[in-house]
């Protein structure tokens, strides 16, 4: 992660993307949606869930994490989001946030549908889903408007592939990502049974099978959608080192903010961090396999 951030700020071709005006826009991107969605979250929870006051997870550390996560997501637009091939800069900013919504947030949150227990009950509710979807839409609109005049061209040539080839590579990516999740769970459970996904989330024994079926389906879905970033942002004929750096960027800006937040809903902090690190390696493997798949289909 340090290598990625250092490379971003040290590169001469990137310096014009991080002037004071851009940093100010990032701060506004963090501030404006949070000023609206935090009161909205309390209101929706009260109306839909019938709860009084703020939800239990809305604490000062949670708000601080949310601000830091949004800053990371905003930074991600300056690193990979601006590369999306959409001419209208407002729509480009909106599309960047929506792509995070469908490729990261939706699979992560819905992957818990098959489980039960207090942690899942707290983190997966109609109120949370409603507010989060509204929040993502608002963030996309705010980012697009703030970056309306930010039209930096992608310096890298992108691989042009047919839809058929892309679908095949995406299915391979999806199957591999789901399999890596499954194998990671088995490996963790072999060391200590309390390290399994179901144990960390407090899923009852009766719901374990259903939990893993649903979880695997949505991890496959995530694996099918994540290659959209590869298609539009991964440089053509990227080297292994460039592909690894790209995987680190996808992990940091797209995937991890929606994984690490679970620590605020009750998952053990160190185990949550450990799975976050594991996901970095999973995404790294998937990006390298995707790169190889594209190369093979070009032969």
What are these regions (language model features)?
Residues 2-299:
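Juxtamembrane/disordered regions of integral membrane proteins
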């Amino acid at each position: 992660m340090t290598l990625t951030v250092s490379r971003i700020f040290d590169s001469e071709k990137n310096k014009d993307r991080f002037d004071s005006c851009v940093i100010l826009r990032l701060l506004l991107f963090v501030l404006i949606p949070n000023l609206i969605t935090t009161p909205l979250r309390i209101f929706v929870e009260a109306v839909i869930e019938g709860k009084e006051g703020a939800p239990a997870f809305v604490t000062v550390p949670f708000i601080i994490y949310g601000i830091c996560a949004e800053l990371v997501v905003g930074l991600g637009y300056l690193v990979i989001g601006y590369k999306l091939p959409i001419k209208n800069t407002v729509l480009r900013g909106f599309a960047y946030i929506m792509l995070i919504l469908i490729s990261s947030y939706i699979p992560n949150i819905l992957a818990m549908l098959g489980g039960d227990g207090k942690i899942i009950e707290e983190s997966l509710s109609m109120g949370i889903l409603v507010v989060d979807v509204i929040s993502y839409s608002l963030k996309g609109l705010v980012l697009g408007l703030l970056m309306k005049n930010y039209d930096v061209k992608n310096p890298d040539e992108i691989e042009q592939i047919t839809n058929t080839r892309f679908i095949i590579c995406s299915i391979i990516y999806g199957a591999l990502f789901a399999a890596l999740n499954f194998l990671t769970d088995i490996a963790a459970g072999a060391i200590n049974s309390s390290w399994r996904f179901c144990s960390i989330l407090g899923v009852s024994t009766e719901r374990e099978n259903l939990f893993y079926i649903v979880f695997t389906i949505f991890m496959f879905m995530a694996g099918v959608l994540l290659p959209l970033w590869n298609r539009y942002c991964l440089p053509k004929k990227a080297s292994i080192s460039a592909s690894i750096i790209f995987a680190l960027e996808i992990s940091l800006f797209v995937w991890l903010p929606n994984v690490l937040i679970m620590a605020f809903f009750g998952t053990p902090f160190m185990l949550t961090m450990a799975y976050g690190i594991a996901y970095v390696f999973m995404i790294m493997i998937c990006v390298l396999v995707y790169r190889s798949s594209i190369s093979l289909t070009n032969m």
